């Protein structure tokens, strides 16, 4: 999967790097270093005197320490700090040099003397003593460790242990089970949170595990002709459905039981969302009983039609024919990973864009956005209910249904709303996270559909930054959390599997469940388990204008305080001369990748047009008006608008970073302005309430922004710590060729480019 050859230099230095003695100081107390362990976490194997490589061409910045393999992570423990690494982002579950076992993609061991290298798999034998260990991670990191001073047998054992525990064959071997078992036995809490999570975000996020959550969603959207069905309570009909779901009121429970056997996996039609005009979004699996297919199809569509106030005809969309398959998506993502991880920068720089295009990843992102935009037209303009159909109804429909709701409903563009959307359309709708994320190393079922969805959301966030309450840091953290085997949110193929497997595990461990349906795993939405309140402020978007509390009246989402609709086009990442992505005249000398190119008819033809339905006109009309960020948003589908998600895919690549630059510099300034506005508003409220009292500033912890005016002169407020990968740091987590200390790196850090090499050599 990955190239095993050593990378060539990415940048040529005019100075020989300062070499430090590789031999370890005998006085170093590495043996006394201890890992930080979670409840249920045990040390499987460890090796002392390991060197973590920071750059492949020099040992000057390498770190010495202990490499520890546990049943949860691979951990490198050192007393040294990484040079040039200054950032204020810390995961409370994982150390700076820790990687969860479920985040490991591939393990390669090397013996320099024998010139041998091998990809380690589960329960494989190793016939040589490794001198080097290379770990390829699912988040595109590369970690390199040298065993020059370590005991050969100890190094061999830790490599074999890592291969064994990072490739489990049984679901109950994942760390979350041991963690929860310890919490139940000790009746304790972690960071003040119960085993199943608590936290502010978690408590306010509907999990859709109960009847009441679905009922509230019906009322929120005004779906008066739909009802919550409990026919699958106890998973009596289907193990691929939630216990509670929403169906047309005209369909009786007996009808559902009768027709369920005809659907693949017995996945009957599931209601997703209702428009204020009465049109509904529904998803279902294919009908496998060909003899009764027409009869059942008519009965289901008739029930959906009767739930519409206009009795509009249902529009069916077969996703298996309209969007790429899960196999094609996996192939594209593998090529993207290969491009971002393996190839040396200097070899791929000239052909990087063409290589990116050949992966087809951005093409697939665009195709899903186009499909969702077409369905937005059907629901919003044509006022027709839409039925999403695919073979099993639990893969492609998760992506499309979620994108449609994001474009139509501003509630899902808030943090709580977005989390409830993932719970409703992914977790409770039985998206197979276990198989698609490949937690058990069954590569034949792997496909990054959830990553694709987050990428599509990121595209919308880039185009409409003021429409979303969350930031791309939040999206990246959600992506990373799907690789941590601690949260039940992204660990199972279905809610039924969670209940079944956890109940079996509880019986084996003699855990008393009481009235609970299975073990209660921590929820990923309890962000206090991973991040401090300060770091969680990075989730808040200072550009977000929908900060007023939304309410629902007859299905229409409204706001108590509405802002002007005529927003500046620059807030959407577009030049001022463009109205919603459209321009009347083309520039006289347009740039190669200018966004001010005229949106010609042939460009619009790239969007699927249904004959006679006016989709093209709807698309044109929408883009000819200022965007209402409290209403419908449509994606800009021109090739220049679909970009690579650099913070997620290229954050560990030093060559791709911009020191003191990138979007974070603007984010820094906007956050400071937003913080000052928040302070002034607080003072104004205090003055209006108590005119004669002394007006004070709000408590710092109550400020929603990460960057604050009161910290302007501290390290947090300084641009020195910022780069385009903020809050992540590429230094120390990727063994690329070192650019530290070269004229180029000094120029990027503000040095004058005409300094001689002698001058640079004399600098500290």
UniProtKB/Swiss-Prot annotation:
Gene3D superfamilies linked: Pleckstrin-homology domain (PH domain)/Phosphotyrosine-binding domain (PTB)
One GO process term, biological-process aspect: phosphatidylinositol dephosphorylation
SUPFAM superfamilies: (Phosphotyrosine protein) phosphatases II (SSF52799), PH domain-like (SSF50729)
Residue intervals passing through the bilayer: none
Recorded superkingdom: Eukaryota
PROSITE patterns: PPASE_MYOTUBULARIN (PS51339)
GO cellular component, one term: membrane
Signal sequence extent: none
InterPro entries (UniProt xref): MTMR10_PH-GRAM, MTMR10_PTP, MTMR12-like_C, Myotubularin, Myotubularin-like_Pase_dom, PH-like_dom_sf, Prot-tyrosine_phosphatase-like
Domain Myotubularin phosphatase: start-end pairs: 208-649
Pfam families according to UniProt: 3-PAP (PF12578), Myotub-related (PF06602)
Any one GO molecular function term: phosphatidylinositol-3-phosphate phosphatase activity
Family: Belongs to the protein-tyrosine phosphatase family. Non-receptor class myotubularin subfamily.
Name listed for the protein in its UniProt record: Myotubularin-related protein 10-B
Lineage: Eukaryota, Metazoa, Chordata, Craniata, Vertebrata
Gene: mtmr10-b
């Amino acid at each position: 999967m990955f190239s095993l050859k050593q990378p060539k230099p990415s940048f040529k230095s005019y100075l020989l790097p300062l070499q430090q003695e590789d031999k370890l100081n005998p006085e170093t107390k590495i043996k006394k270093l201890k890992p930080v362990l979670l409840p249920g976490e045990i040390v499987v194997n460890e090796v002392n005197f390991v060197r973590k490589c920071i750059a492949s061409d020099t040992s000057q910045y390498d770190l010495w320490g202990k490499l520890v393999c546990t049943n949860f992570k691979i951990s490198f423990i050192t007393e040294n700090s990484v040079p040039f690494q200054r950032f204020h982002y810390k995961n409370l579950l994982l150390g700076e040099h820790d990687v969860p076992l479920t985040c490991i993609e591939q393990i390669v061991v090397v013996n320099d003397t024998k010139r041998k290298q091998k990809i380690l798999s589960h329960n494989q034998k190793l016939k040589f003593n490794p001198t080097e260990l290379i770990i390829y991670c699912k988040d595109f990191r590369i970690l390199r460790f040298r065993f020059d001073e370590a005991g050969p047998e100890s190094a061999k054992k830790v490599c074999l242990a890592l291969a064994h525990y990072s490739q489990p064959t049984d679901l109950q071997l994942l760390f979350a089970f041991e963690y929860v078992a310890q919490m139940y036995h000790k009746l304790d809490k972690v960071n003040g949170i119960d085993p199943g999570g608590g936290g502010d975000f978690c408590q306010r996020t509907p999990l859709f595990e109960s009847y009441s959550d679905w009922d509230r969603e019906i009322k929120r959207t005004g779906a008066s002709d739909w009802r919550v069905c409990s026919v699958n309570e106890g998973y009596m009909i289907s193990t691929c459905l939630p216990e509670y779901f929403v169906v047309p009121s005209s369909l009786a429970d007996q009808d559902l039981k009768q027709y369920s056997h005809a659907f693949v996996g017995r996945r009957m039609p599931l209601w997703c969302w209702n428009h204020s005009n009465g049109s509904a979004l529904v998803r279902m699996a294919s009908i496998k009983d060909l003899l009764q297919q027409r009869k059942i199809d008519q009965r289901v569509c008739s029930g959906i039609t009767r739930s519409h106030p206009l009795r509009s005809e249902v529009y069916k969309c077969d996703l298996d024919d309209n969007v790429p398959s899960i196999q094609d998506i996996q192939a594209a993502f593998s090529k993207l990973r290969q491009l971002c991880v393996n190839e040396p920068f200097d070899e791929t720089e000239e052909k990087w864009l063409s290589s990116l295009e050949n992966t087809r990843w951005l093409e697939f992102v665009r195709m899903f956005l186009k499909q969702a935009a077409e369905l937005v037209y059907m629901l919003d303009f044509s006022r027709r209910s839409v039925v999403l159909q695919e073979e099993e109804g639990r893969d492609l429909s998760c992506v499309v249904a979620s994108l449609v709701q994001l474009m139509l409903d501003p509630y899902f563009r808030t943090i709580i709303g977005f989390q409830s959307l993932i719970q409703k359309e992914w977790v409770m709708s039985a998206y197979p996270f276990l198989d698609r994320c490949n937690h058990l190393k069954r590569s034949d079922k792997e496909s990054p559909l959830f990553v694709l969805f987050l990428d599509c959301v990121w595209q919308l966030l880039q185009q409409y930054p003021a429409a979303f309450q969350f930031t791309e840091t939040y999206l990246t953290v959600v992506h990373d959390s799907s690789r941590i085997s601690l949260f039940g949110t992204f660990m199972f193929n279905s809610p039924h599997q969670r209940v079944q497997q956890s109940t079996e595990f509880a019986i084996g461990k003699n855990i008393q469940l009481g009235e609970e349906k299975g073990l209660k795993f921590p929820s990923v939405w309890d962000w206090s388990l991973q991040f401090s309140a300060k770091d969680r402020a990075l989730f808040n978007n200072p550009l977000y204008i929908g900060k007023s509390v939304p309410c629902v009246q007859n299905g229409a989402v409204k706001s108590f305080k509405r802002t002007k609709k005529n927003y500046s086009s620059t807030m959407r990442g577009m030049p001022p001369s463009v109205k919603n992505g459209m321009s009347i005249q083309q520039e006289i000398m347009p740039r190669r990748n200018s966004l001010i190119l005229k949106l010609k008819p042939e460009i619009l033809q790239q969007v699927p047009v249904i004959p006679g339905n006016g989709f093209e006109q709807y698309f044109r009309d929408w883009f000819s008006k200022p965007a209402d960020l409290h209403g419908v948003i449509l994606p800009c589908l021109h090739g220049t608008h679909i970009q690579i998600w650099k913070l997620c895919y290229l954050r560990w690549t030093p060559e791709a970073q911009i020191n003191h630059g990138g979007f974070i510099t603007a984010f820094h300034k906007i956050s400071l302005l937003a913080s000052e506005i928040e302070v002034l508003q607080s003072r104004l409220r205090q003055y209006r309430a108590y005119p004669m009292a002394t007006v004070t500033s709000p408590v710092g912890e109550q400020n929603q922004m990460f960057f604050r005016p009161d910290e302007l002169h501290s390290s947090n407020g300084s641009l020195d710590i910022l780069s385009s990968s903020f809050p992540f740091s590429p230094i120390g987590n990727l063994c690329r060729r070192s650019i530290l200390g070269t004229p180029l790196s000094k120029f990027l850090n503000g040095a004058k480019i005409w300094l001689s090499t002698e001058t640079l050599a004399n600098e500290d």
